[in-house]
Amino acid sequence: MTTILRIDSSIKGEAAVSRRLTQRILDRLLEAHPDATVVSRDLAQGIRQIDGPWLGSVFTAPEQRTADQQEIARTADAVMAEVKEADILVIALPVYNFGAPAQLKSWVDHIARRGESFVYTETGPVGLLTGKRAIVAFTSDGTPLGSELDHASGWLRQVLGFVGITDVDFVAADRMVFGADEAMARAEAAVAALAA
């Protein structure tokens, strides 16, 4: 059975274009995988930023963690497990000031863990999360996908590839201030054309 992990990150809640787009992508995937299990994580509801106690907790063997470390590591381990168990990731990438939202960066920090999602070898890093697909809902007011102003999509593609997820598609509703209806129509067409 297919497991789909949906990651939303906009602070705009239900009014977010990226949230509407991740829902459309999810609907498209469910047409092809009606029995899929869907796991959703809304990063705007909060995800811990990494810090010293976080680092000490997640890199301590579970059986050696203190009670405080167990509590800190609980969410980090749950986030990591969600990604490991997913076959398809649907990730909202709203562009804030040319980059990704801080909460999406925090999610990436939770999943880019040496020994869990990648290892270093003599020939370089090797991602461990292979065999997965990611579909990214890229939204922006004025930043075109892939432009020199876009510091979000290349970063996310790099991070996903680093952990082994190389099958990545982008669906863009970009430059919304220059025509929201046209941008959404292009995004809808891209969703319809997705190989599910």
Curated annotation (Swiss-Prot):
It is an enzyme of class 1 (oxidoreductase). FMN binds at residue 10. Its cofactor is FMN. It catalyses: 2 a quinone + NADH + H(+) = 2 a 1,4-benzosemiquinone + NAD(+); N,N-dimethyl-1,4-phenylenediamine + anthranilate + 2 NAD(+) = 2-(4-dimethylaminophenyl)diazenylbenzoate + 2 NADH + 2 H(+). It comes from the Bacteria. GO terms for molecular function: electron transfer activity; FMN binding; oxidoreductase activity, acting on NAD(P)H as acceptor; oxidoreductase activity, acting on NAD(P)H, quinone or similar compound as acceptor. Binds 1 FMN per subunit. InterPro entries: Flavodoxin_fold, Flavoprotein-like_sf, FMN-dep_NADH:Q_OxRdtase_AzoR1, NADH:quinone_OxRdtase_FMN_depd. Keywords: Flavoprotein, FMN, NAD, Oxidoreductase. Its EC number is 1.6.5.-, 1.7.1.17. Quinone reductase that provides resistance to thiol-specific stress caused by electrophilic quinones. Homodimer. Belongs to the azoreductase type 1 family. PANTHER family: FMN-DEPENDENT NADH-AZOREDUCTASE 1 (PTHR43741), FMN-DEPENDENT NADH:QUINONE OXIDOREDUCTASE (PTHR43741:SF2). This is FMN-dependent NADH:quinone oxidoreductase. It comes from Cereibacter sphaeroides (strain ATCC 17029 / ATH 2.4.9).
